[in-house]
C-alpha cells in the first residue's frame, strides 16, 4: 500500500453566498458593495450607538428559497444570535448570525456521476443553512499603523451553507461547489460570483488512517479561497501536508490556514477557534419571526425545475452536449436568454426551409455558449452582461448564418464588433452591410494566388488530398477579405488553380 493510500481524506465545506437583494439585511442602505468605498453605508452598518436593526423581508424570502432548493427542512421561526469577536471589519464587536436555530437544516444536494463529474452518485448532506450579515473588508494596507476599511459590504445579506464532512476527494468538493453555484443562480438567489467575492468558501480538511477510518484526527480550516479551482488545489495540498506529517511521525494540529498562490502551499494564519470563543448570545433587538407553512409554500411555488431536470431537457435537444448545457446553466441569466433566443429564432426562420430552420437551431449551443458568452467575458474594456445583445439580434445573426447569407467568419466578426460597441455596431446594420458587399473577383484571385505562392508545403499537401488543408486556405482568405468573400467561390478558385495545375503535369 502506498503512503497516500494508507490515508482517507475527509473534507467539509462552509460556503458563504451573498443574496441578490436591493437593500442590506438590517438597514435601508443599498446592497451595492462593489461601488466606491463607503458609498453604500448606513449608520447601523457602522454600528453608531442607538441604531437598531430593521429586518429586510426580501432577504428572508431569498434565504428561505435557498434552503428549499437545497432540500432543507425549514425552521418554524427565524431567530438571530450575536457572534462576538473583535476585528476591524466588524465595528459592533459581534456579527448577527444564527446559531441556536438555523433557517434550514437536514438538507441535501444530489451529485450525479453522469452530469456532475463525480466518480459515483452521492448525496451531499447540508447540515444547516443560516442567514447572517456580511462584514466590512480591508481594501488596502499601507503600513502596520494604517488600515483602510470599506463598509459597503457590512450588513449585506449572506447565507452560510454548511455541509457534512462527506467529501473524500478535492475533486468531488469542487464538483459540489459548481453544482451549488448553478442551483443558486437558477433560483435567482444570488449571482454567486466568486471572482467578485459574492460566493466564498472555507474548507475543513482532515485525514484518517485507512485501517481505522472512524478515528478522526485534527481538522484544519482553509480560509479565503477565491475560486473553485483554488478550493480543489488548496485542499489537495493541505491533505498531502497532513499526510506527510503523519508519515514522518508528527500529527496535524487544529488551526486556520490559507492558500499562498506564489508558494503553491497552505500557510498558517492563526490557531483555530471553537464555538465557545465567540460567546454566542441571542440577538435581543430582533424578535422571533414566524415562518408559517403558507409562507414557505408560497416561496416553494416560485422554484422552477431542478438543475438535473434542466440538463436532461437540454440534452434531449440532441444538438446540446453536456459541456455546453452545463456552461449555459452556469452562466448568469443564460437559461432565460436561451429560452427567449429560441422563440426569436423561430420568428426569423419561419419563412425559411425546414432544413435551414433545423440548421439554425443546431447553431445555438456553439454561438451562444462559446462565441457570445466568450465575447462578453473577453470584451476589451470591461466584461459584458448577456443583455448586451438582445436575443432577437442574435437570432437575426444565426438565421442569416444558417441560410448562407453570412459565412461563419463574417458572423464571428460581426458578433465581436457588436459586443465591443453595441450602440455603434448594430447587428442588423452589420449583417445587411455584409450581405450587400460585393468582393471584387480579381482581388479575390490575387488573395488566393498570393497564399498559394507563399505556402508551397500546404499546396503540396492539398494536391495529395490531405484533409483540412483546403479549409486552412479558405479560412485565411476569409480573414483577409474581412468575411466578405464567399467560401464556395474561394474553394472553386483554389481547386481551379491547384488541382488543374496538378492535372496538367
From Swiss-Prot:
Reactions catalysed according to its record: L-glutamyl-tRNA(Gln) + L-glutamine + ATP + H2O = L-glutaminyl-tRNA(Gln) + L-glutamate + ADP + phosphate + H(+)
Region forming the signal peptide: none
GO terms (BP aspect): glutaminyl-tRNAGln biosynthesis via transamidation; mitochondrial translation
Statement: the UniProt record of this protein carries the keyword Hydrolase: no
Keywords: ATP-binding, Ligase, Mitochondrion, Nucleotide-binding, Protein biosynthesis
A GO MF term: ATP binding
One GO CC annotation: mitochondrion
Subunit structure: Subunit of the heterotrimeric GatCAB amidotransferase (AdT) complex, composed of A, B and C subunits.
Stated family: Belongs to the GatB/GatE family. GatB subfamily.
Record HAMAP family: GatB (MF_00121)
Role summary: Allows the formation of correctly charged Gln-tRNA(Gln) through the transamidation of misacylated Glu-tRNA(Gln) in the mitochondria. The reaction takes place in the presence of glutamine and ATP through an activated gamma-phospho-Glu-tRNA(Gln).
Protein name as it appears in the record: Glutamyl-tRNA(Gln) amidotransferase subunit B, mitochondrial
Organism: Schizosaccharomyces japonicus (strain yFS275 / FY16936) (Fission yeast)
Amino acid at each position: 500500500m502506498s503512503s497516500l493510500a494508507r490515508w482517507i481524506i475527509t473534507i467539509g465545506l462552509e460556503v458563504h453566498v451573498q443574496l441578490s437583494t436591493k437593500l442590506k439585511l438590517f438597514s435601508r442602505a443599498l446592497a451595492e458593495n462593489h461601488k466606491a468605498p463607503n458609498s453604500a453605508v448606513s449608520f447601523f452598518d457602522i454600528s453608531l450607538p442607538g441604531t437598531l436593526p430593521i429586518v429586510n423581508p426580501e432577504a428572508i424570502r431569498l434565504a428561505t428559497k435557498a434552503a428549499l432548493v437545497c432540500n432543507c427542512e425549514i425552521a418554524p421561526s427565524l431567530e438571530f444570535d450575536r457572534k462576538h469577536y473583535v476585528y476591524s471589519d466588524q465595528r459592533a464587536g459581534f456579527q448577527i448570525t444564527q446559531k441556536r436555530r438555523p433557517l434550514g437544516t437536514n438538507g441535501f444536494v444530489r451529485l450525479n456521476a453522469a452530469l456532475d463529474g463525480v466518480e459515483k452518485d452521492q448525496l451531499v448532506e447540508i447540515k444547516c443553512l443560516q442567514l447572517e450579515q456580511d462584514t466590512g473588508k480591508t481594501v488596502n494596507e499601507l503600513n502596520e499603523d494604517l488600515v483602510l476599511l470599506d463598509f459597503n459590504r457590512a450588513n449585506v445579506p449572506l447565507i452560510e451553507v454548511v455541509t457534512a464532512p462527506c467529501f473524500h476527494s478535492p475533486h468531488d468538493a469542487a464538483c459540489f461547489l459548481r453544482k451549488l453555484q448553478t442551483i443558486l443562480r437558477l433560483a435567482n438567489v444570488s449571482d454567486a460570483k466568486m471572482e467578485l467575492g459574492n460566493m466564498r468558501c472555507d474548507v475543513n480538511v482532515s485525514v484518517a488512517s485507512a485501517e481505522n477510518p472512524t478515528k478522526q484526527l485534527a481538522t484544519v480550516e482553509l480560509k479565503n479561497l477565491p475560486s473553485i479551482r483554488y478550493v480543489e488545489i488548496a485542499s489537495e495540498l493541505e491533505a498531502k501536508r497532513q499526510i506527510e506529517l503523519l508519515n514522518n511521525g508528527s500529527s496535524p494540529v487544529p488551526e486556520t490556514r490559507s492558500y499562498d498562490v506564489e508558494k503553491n502551499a497552505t500557510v498558517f494564519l492563526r490557531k483555530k477557534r471553537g464555538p465557545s470563543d465567540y460567546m454566542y448570545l441571542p440577538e435581543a433587538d430582533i424578535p422571533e419571526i414566524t415562518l408559517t407553512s403558507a409562507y414557505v409554500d408560497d416561496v416553494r411555488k416560485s422554484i422552477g425545475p431542478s438543475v438535473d431536470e434542466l440538463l436532461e431537457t437540454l440534452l434531449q435537444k440532441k444538438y446540446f452536449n453536456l459541456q455546453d448545457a452545463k456552461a449555459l446553466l452556469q452562466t448568469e441569466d443564460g437559461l432565460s436568454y436561451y429560452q427567449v433566443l429560441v422563440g426569436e429564432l423561430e420568428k426569423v426562420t419561419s419563412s425559411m426551409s425546414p432544413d435551414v430552420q433545423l440548421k439554425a437551431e443546431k447553431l445555438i449551443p456553439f454561438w451562444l455558449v462559446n462565441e457570445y458568452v466568450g465575447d462578453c467575458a473577453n470584451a476589451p474594456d470591461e466584461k459584458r452582461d448577456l443583455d448586451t445583445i438582445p436575443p432577437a439580434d442574435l437570432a437575426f445573426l444565426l438565421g442569416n448564418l444558417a441560410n448562407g447569407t453570412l459565412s461563419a467568419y463574417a458572423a464571428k466578426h460581426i458578433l465581436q464588433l457588436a459586443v465591443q460597441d453595441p450602440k455603434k455596431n448594430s447587428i442588423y446594420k452589420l449583417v445587411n452591410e455584409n450581405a450587400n458587399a460585393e468582393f471584387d473577383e480579381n482581388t479575390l484571385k490575387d488573395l488566393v494566388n498570393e497564399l498559394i505562392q507563399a505556402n508551397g508545403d500546404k499546396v503540396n499537401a492539398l494536391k495529395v488530398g490531405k484533409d483540412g488543408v483546403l479549409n486552412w486556405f479558405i479560412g485565411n482568405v476569409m480573414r483577409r477579405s474581412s468575411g466578405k468573400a464567399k467560401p464556395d467561390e474561394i474553394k472553386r478558385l483554389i481547386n481551379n488553380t491547384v488541382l488543374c495545375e496538378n492535372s496538367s503535369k
